[in-house]
C-alpha cells in the first residue's frame, strides 16, 4: 500500500537550513504528492527544470478561486476570496494590471532612485551610531533592517515622511510573528485605511509618486476602481517587506558564519553585488509563492497531473539543485554562476516586480554597513539567534549587535 503523502509546508531543518525533505525528494521523487492543512492533496515540484516549467506554462493558473488551487493555511484560504491583484491573475489581466506600475520598478528607474537608497541607508546608520551601544546591544532588525526597505517603498508609494515611523511599526506588527492574530489583523486594517485615505488625497491633489500615477492614469479614466488602487498599493507595500527585512538580517548572520568572505567584503565593498546574488540563492526568503492549479491534464517531470489539481513549485528546493548549482549547500559569494538564473525572485512572467529595487537596496546595505561599522559584531551566540518559526519563510526576528 502506498504511504500517506507527507504534510506540507515542511519544517526547516534548523534556523537557517531548508527542510531536509527537499534534498531527498530531488533525488528520489522530484514531483510528488503532499498533504495540505485542510487534508487536500497537491503536487510538490522540487527540481529546477520542473520549477521553471511550472512558473512559465500557461496551462497552469495563478487564479486562487479556481478548483484545486493549493492554499497553505486557513488565512490563505480566506485571503483567496478577496478581490485579486495582478499577482493572482493570469494573462492577459496579469500584465494589464502589472503594467500599470511596472515602469517604477525597471532597472532604469531604480538607478535614478540610487542616491535616495544610499541616503536612507546612510541616515539610518548615522542614527544608530548616534544612539550607540554603551547601554547594551542594539537590535539591528528594529533599527536598520526593518526601516531600510519600509522607508524606501513608502516613499515610492508617496507616503509623507512624518508618517513613516508609525506605518513601519504597523507593518512590523503585521509580519513579525510575535503579534497575536487580532493585533496583526488590526495593523493590516490600519494600513489599508491609511492607503485608502492617501488614494483620496492623491485623486484631489496628485504628486510625483506611485499612488498618484495609479489615480491619474487608471482610476480617473475608469480603468480600475479606487479599491483596486488601494489593493495594488497594499500589495507593493507588504509583498516584499518582510522578505527584505529577513534578507538583510540573514546576510549579516551568514557573513559572520563565513569570516573569510566577510573579510573579503570588508576589504572590497564592490563585491556586494555578487554577495547579494548568492545570498538570494542560498536563503530563498520567499519560498512558498509559486503555486498553481492545472487548467487541463498535463505532464510535469514524468508525472500525470489532472485538471484542477494543485501544484506547489519550490524555488527554495530548486536553488539547491546540484544539477544546476555546483556544491549548492555551500555559501560561496565567489561561485561561478551557471547560465541559469537563481530563483530567489521567482521566474517567468510572475517574477518579482521589485527584484531590481530589492537587489539595489541589499547591495547598498552590504557595500555600506561594514564601512560604517567595521567592528560590528553579533552580541549573542549563533544558537541563541531568534529565527522565524520553522514552518514558514526563513528569517530573523531580532538581531542584537554591538559596534
Curated annotation (Swiss-Prot):
Pfam family, one: p450
SUPFAM superfamilies assigned: Cytochrome P450
Enzyme Commission code(s) on record: 1.14.-.-
Keywords assigned: Heme, Iron, Metal-binding, Monooxygenase, Oxidoreductase
Cofactor: heme
Segments forming a coiled coil: none
Record-linked InterPro entries: Cyt_P450 (IPR001128), Cyt_P450_B (IPR002397), Cyt_P450_sf (IPR036396)
Leader peptide range in chain numbering: none
Record-level Gene Ontology MF annotations: heme binding; iron ion binding; monooxygenase activity; oxidoreductase activity, acting on paired donors, with incorporation or reduction of molecular oxygen
Binding site for heme: 352
Enzyme class: oxidoreductase
Family, per entry: Belongs to the cytochrome P450 family.
UniProt-recorded name of the protein: Cytochrome P450 55A2
Taxonomic placement: Eukaryota, Fungi, Dikarya, Ascomycota, Pezizomycotina
Gene that encodes it: CYP55A2
